Each structure stands twice: as C-alpha cells, then as structure tokens.
Amino acid sequence: MCAYYPASKVEVGGFTARHYDRLINTITFGGYSSVIQSAIRLMMIKPIDKILDLGAGTGRNACLMMKHLSANGELVGLDISEEMISQFKKNCAVFPNAKIINKRIDKDLPYEEYFDKVFISFVLHGFPQEARKQIIRNVFKALKKDGEFFILDYNEFSIKEMPLYLRIPFKFMECSYAFDFIEKDWQKILAEEGFNHFEKHFFFGNYVRLLRSVKV
C-alpha cells in the first residue's frame, strides 16, 4: 500500500514483486508452500464455487484454488500492483475462469451476494484498522448468505512473549499495522460485522492462523 498507506509493507514492487514467490519460500524455509496448500484444502472448495481472492498477488494461491474448481466455477482476484497482476495473468493463463482485476479492496466493491467464498492471505494485517473494517464490510456484501470468509494471517499474540529469535525478524520485517493487527480480537470484530460459525486452524507454532467465518 505504499501510495495509500506508507507505513505498510503489504504492497511490493520491483525486484521483490518479480521474485515474490521465491523470496517467500526462502524466508519461510519452504514452510509457506505447505501452509497455503493446507489452508486451501481446509477451505473445502466445491467445483462450482465462486471465489473472490483479495490481494491476489502473483496468482500462486489462485492457481491452487482453481485446481478444485470445475469449468462452472469462477475465481476473481483483486490487486493493485501491475507487476503482480502481470504475474497472475501468466501463472493462471491455463484457467480461463480465473481473472484478475486492478482494484483497491479497501474501497467500495461492486459485488453483492455473488461469491460462495472469499479468501485473503497475509494482506489484512497491512492495513490500518478502519480500512480493515471496510474490507470486512466489502466481504460481507460480496458473499451469498452462508458464504464463507477465510483469513490466512497472523494469529493473536504478544510480541513481548515471542522468543528472541522470532521477535527480532518479526519486528524487522513487519510494520506498525501488523503489530496492531495481532492485538485485535478478530473473532469479535467479525461477529460485530455479521459473521459467525468460526473455525480456526493454526500453523507455524500458532503464530499463523486460518480463521473461517460464515455470513449469517
């Protein structure tokens, strides 16, 4: 979000954007790949699902989700980085029912009760709280009744209680928005916006969580 939220580290460009997937694999010692695959399996995607991928990036996650969809399914990715969008189009070229749109996710979106599932992976923490709430409201509006919202991101924890070998890189790599994000009760926040039926799955020693909620 450099142009919109200078303190954020969610939006990347240049060398980092061009080699994003490789860098993430290196930083996590290959762990991210197994986490995202596990998370997508836990989504229990149906062949005809319509999925909205917020902050879709290179399309890596979208391509994994597309493998669970039939020709009658659909995936729409949203991103604002031209470099990421270019990679998405290249990576997902074999899936005609997957598309990427250049659109901010923290502003009103045109979708209303259209999607069965919405997925957001390591993006929500990079916004200030009011923008996060707008994103959640966009998700609620975009989902069909009983539609599912999946947030793969940091769990709630205290930086002070992290082991030193994790605390130092976390504080170096992340931004102030992330430090705020991990202190929030996201189940409570989502419930206040109309979501319920929560389900949680943890990764990386409980520092990462897949939080599922349902529009009721």
Language-model-detected regions and their locations in the chain:
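A short SAM/SAH-binding and catalytic strip from SAM-dependent methyltransferases
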Residues: 117-130
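Short glycine-centered segments of the SAM/dcSAM-binding site in methyltransferase folds
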Residues: 50, 74, 146-148
